[in-house]
Amino acid sequence: MMKYRYTYYVLLCLTLVGLASCEMKDELLGKGEQGGSGEVGVLDLKLKVVPPSYGNGGVSSKSSSTELIVPKAEDMIVKVFNASMELQDYFESYADYLKESQYVLEQGTYYIEAYSGDNYEVTSEYPYYELLDTCVIKAKEVTLVDKACELQSAILYLTLSEEFLNACKDDYAITITNGSGVLSVGKGDARIVYIRPGMKTTVTIRATEKITGKPVIWTFGLADSEGKINSQDLFRIEIKDLE
């Protein structure tokens, strides 16, 4: 008698599992509460982060004061907006999105935004990476979006020559401002600065000559031929002297 009860219990469990699987499938295919209309599909978002490449003489992408900071793809914030630009879903990180076994959406047009955090005006710590894309979800289909977050900041790469370091005291300060934000760089600070694109950025160097004790100031601007700064612009500045 116990044998038959055990067999019945196993069959009942298998039946329940099968029903659950069917319900999940019906949800994806638009059945059940959707009334068989087939109105939903799946968004399969494949996200990566691609740093800029400047070739020889550019900057590398590791993690010291003279190398690019590159965020991890799993740390990107992800937002999904519907066709009316209303926020559909918000994920604190791409890693949270990946926890979804299947990300189901009603059919229609969606806008995807993935980004690394705040878009600072001037910073040495938080380069701004971003992805903006549009996709169309079709009923009963999986829509693949395989895209890369790319750097949206401009880069200022500062190098101090031996000539400058020998001539000036260690109390020098380099101030970078784009009119909205400002950053001061001193001895031991990062030599790569990330700037939000926009109008011309001004760099001011203040130092003291070792021999004379005379304060010196040097100011110059960063911009393209149109007086602007664009995403991924690279400004390599070697400071040799202040004459």
What are these model-predicted stretches?
Residues 22-190, 197-243:
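Sec-type signal peptide cleavage vicinity
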